[in-house]
Amino acid sequence: MIRVLLVEDDPVIRDTTCYFLKSQQNFEVVCAETGGDALSHAREKFDVILMDILLPDTNGVDLCQRLRSWHHCPIIFTSCLDDTDTIVRALEMGGDDFLAKPYNNKILLARIMANIRRVQM
C-alpha cells in the first residue's frame, strides 16, 4: 500500500487528485487542507507527501523544513507559482520534486512512483 499525504487547500484540486490517486491500485490518500492539518498527520508513516506551496496558514516551503526534522519520505511540491526562484527555493529547502499546476494526473503519478523508487534503492 502506497500512503500519500496530500496537502492542498483548493477543494477542487484536492478532491480531483485524491479521487485519481485512490483509483490507482494500492494507494491510500490522507488529505490535509492546511499546514496545521498536515502537521497533525505528520507523525504517521507516508511514502510520499504532495504539498501546495500556498497554504492558508503557512508557506509550504516553511512547512517542508519542519517536516524534514522527522520525515525523510519524498516531498513533491505542487504550485501555480512556477517561476525559477520559487522552484529553486522549494528544492533547496527540502523538496524532492516540483510540479506546476495545473498538472496532468498521469505525470503526477509517474513523479510519485519515480520518487518512491529512488528512495527504495
Language-model features: locations:
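Acidic catalytic/metal-coordinating carboxylates
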Residues: 34, 59-62
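C-terminal output helix
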Residues: 85, 103-112, 116
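Active-site residues of response regulator receiver
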Residues: 52, 79
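The feature encodes the CheY-like receiver
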Residues: 56, 83, 101
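Acidic, metal-coordinating helix/loop segments flanking the phosphotransfer/catalytic sites
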Residues: 31-48
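Conserved acidic carboxylate
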Residues: 8
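Two-component/phosphorelay signaling modules centered on CheY-like receiver
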Residues: 11-30
